[in-house]
């Protein structure tokens, strides 16, 4: 039976969930990234329709905007791409694109934002993959059927160097399925 989690606020609940996911993913985000991830999750749970938008068009549209409007749109694109790649990878499949597509677009949005206003957006671009890994682990905390499938995990690891995806490939291939175990064990994890 699943245990009932009681936290005093929604922020504390998200914080606890992110911490549990970090432990499950064997990733430790710094306090700034952890806080940003919690706030992003809170923001998008209040407006779930935002994740279903066409991010590529928004990304292109941001080039036509200036100032605060452009900054907000780039941040939203980066945040949405993070959530889709981490929490809703099946959406990528439905749209007939790889998870790596959203990773690259999200990192680009954060990097452009960093280039324009600096701040910590460069850190978000650089640490996009570990944050995505934490979100993947969050999906799997209470439901192991939420794993991304083996081929998607392999592709994600190849494209991004995701350590969580690599672990999924190792776990999924331990029975000799599809991918030679000795090849995976010798994989370069320095992506």
Residue spans for each PLM region:
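Polar/charged low-complexity regulatory segments
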Residues: 1-191
């Amino acid at each position: 039976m699943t245990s009932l989690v009681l936290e005093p606020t929604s922020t504390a609940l998200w914080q606890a969930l992110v911490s549990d996911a970090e432990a499950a993913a064997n990733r430790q985000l710094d306090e700034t990234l952890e806080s940003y991830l919690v706030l992003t999750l809170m923001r998008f749970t209040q407006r779930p329709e935002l994740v279903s938008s066409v991010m590529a068009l928004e990304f292109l549209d941001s080039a036509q905007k200036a100032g605060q409007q452009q900054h907000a749109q780039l941040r939203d694109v980066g945040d949405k791409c993070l959530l889709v790649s981490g929490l809703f990878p099946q959406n990528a499949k439905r749209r007939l694109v790889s998870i790596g597509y959203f990773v690259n677009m999200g990192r680009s949005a954060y990097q452009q934002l960093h280039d324009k206003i600096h701040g910590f957006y460069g850190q978000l671009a650089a640490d996009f993959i570990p944050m995505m890994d934490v979100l993947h682990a969050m999906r799997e905390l209470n439901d192991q059927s939420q794993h991304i499938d083996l081929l998607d995990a392999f592709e994600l690891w190849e494209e991004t160097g995701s350590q969580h995806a690599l672990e999924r490939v190792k776990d999924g291939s331990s029975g000799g399925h599809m991918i030679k175990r000795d090849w995976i064990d010798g994989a370069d994890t320095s992506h």
